[in-house]
């Protein structure tokens, strides 16, 4: 399975309202519930007014379009990383999953996954 590195520093943040969001940005994940509006975006694209934010994330995505019937893809990746004390934060689109890892552990995470047979694509 191929994993594609995302060539950006990312931030996870919380915003007060939808008015803070700029949907013209290329890399933007929005989660909205009755309790909060969360955003994952390129660090340079973080809205000016955030309630909270956590910088220092990097990401890779699972290459290709994943069929909804596939089972265990994220479980295998998360198990490999958890066994090596590397935490993850995952966001998904209709097509695939994006795995975020803190910047200081990102290269170690990719090395571990490569050792387990994953192909890392630039």
Regions found by a protein language model. Give the residues of each.
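Regulatory modules associated with amino-acid/nitrogen control
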Residues: 1-84, 108-122
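A generic structural motif
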Residues: 36-41, 96-102
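A cross-kingdom feature marking solvent-exposed beta-strand/loop segments within repeated
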Residues: 84-99, 105
């Amino acid at each position: 399975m191929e994993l594609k590195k995302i060539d950006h520093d990312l931030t996870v943040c919380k915003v007060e309202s939808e008015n803070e969001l700029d949907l013209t940005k290329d890399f933007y994940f929005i989660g909205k519930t009755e309790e909060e509006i969360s955003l994952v975006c390129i660090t340079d694209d973080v809205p000016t007014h955030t309630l909270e934010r956590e910088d220092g994330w990097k990401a890779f995505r699972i290459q290709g379009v994943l069929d909804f019937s596939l089972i265990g893809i994220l479980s295998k990746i998360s198990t490999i990383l958890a066994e090596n004390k590397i935490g993850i934060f995952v966001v998904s689109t209709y097509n695939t999953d994006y795995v975020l890892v803190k910047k200081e552990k990102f290269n170690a995470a990719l090395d571990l996954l490569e050792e387990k047979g994953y192909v890392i694509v630039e």
